[in-house]
């Protein structure tokens, strides 16, 4: 093996042999066992002879739908592939979350969902998509998974509406937010700064609905970091 990406762990073995009393003392268990954990999609990678989870047939069909909607080619550019994979992963996760009763919001699990959808929308923007499109991928996600998760089909229209509404809401602010982000970024760079202020990150969140991890990703693309501690403090005020 190596520390590179050449190999993927398909499963692992956990040897349950000792009991930890919480104070650093270990004693042997009377009953020992070996626990095996295996990732289903990682197993599919090995069985199908593909390079990654994103190349497994059921996942690739979702990516193919994304490429059809965006016009982007998969496998030609690392940067493009990252965006396609982010969109594929996030819309799949979002579909299941909404089916399970989660709605986009600014707190708790609803905020996780909002962050997923808005990050995916931003990557669509990077691929040149200027209008809502994620909702059109929902049907493919459902088609690939309804055999084992039949309730997805029952809630298909509802899931699609939720995704489309969230996309449309973000679309109203993303262009203005990107413009302000560019201006704020230029100000930091003009001063030779490498840290994007928490106050500016909060402004993007509070005014334009940019989740902190979305801002952090955009800042990282520019070789900078975000003062997330200052952002968190402003969130608490």
Question: Where are the predicted features?
Answer:
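A glycine- and charged-residue-rich anion-binding loop/surface
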Residues: 1-237
């Amino acid at each position: 093996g190596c520390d590179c990406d050449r190999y993927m762990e398909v499963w692992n073995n956990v040897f349950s042999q000792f009991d930890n009393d919480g104070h650093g003392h270990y004693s042997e268990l009377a009953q020992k066992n070996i626990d095996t954990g295996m990732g289903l999609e990682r197993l599919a990678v090995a069985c199908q002879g593909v390079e990654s989870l994103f190349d497994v047939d059921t996942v690739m069909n979702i990516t193919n739908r994304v490429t059809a909607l965006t016009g982007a080619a998969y496998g030609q550019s690392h940067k493009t592939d990252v965006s396609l994979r982010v969109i594929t992963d996030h819309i799949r996760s979002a579909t299941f979350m909404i089916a399970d009763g989660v709605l986009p919001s600014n707190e708790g699990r609803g905020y996780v969902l909002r962050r997923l959808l808005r990050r995916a929308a931003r990557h669509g923007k990077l691929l040149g998509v200027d209008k809502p499109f994620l909702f059109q991928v929902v049907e493919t996600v459902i088609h690939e998974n309804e055999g084992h998760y039949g309730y997805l089909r029952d809630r298909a229209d509802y899931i699609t509406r939720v995704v489309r509404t969230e996309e449309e809401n973000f679309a109203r602010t993303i262009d203005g937010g990107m413009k302000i982000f560019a201006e704020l970024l230029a100000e930091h760079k003009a001063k030779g700064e490498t840290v994007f202020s928490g106050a500016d990150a909060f402004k993007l969140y509070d005014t334009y609905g940019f989740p902190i991890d979305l801002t952090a990703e955009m800042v990282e693309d520019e070789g900078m970091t975000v003062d997330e501690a200052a952002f968190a403090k402003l969130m608490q005020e």
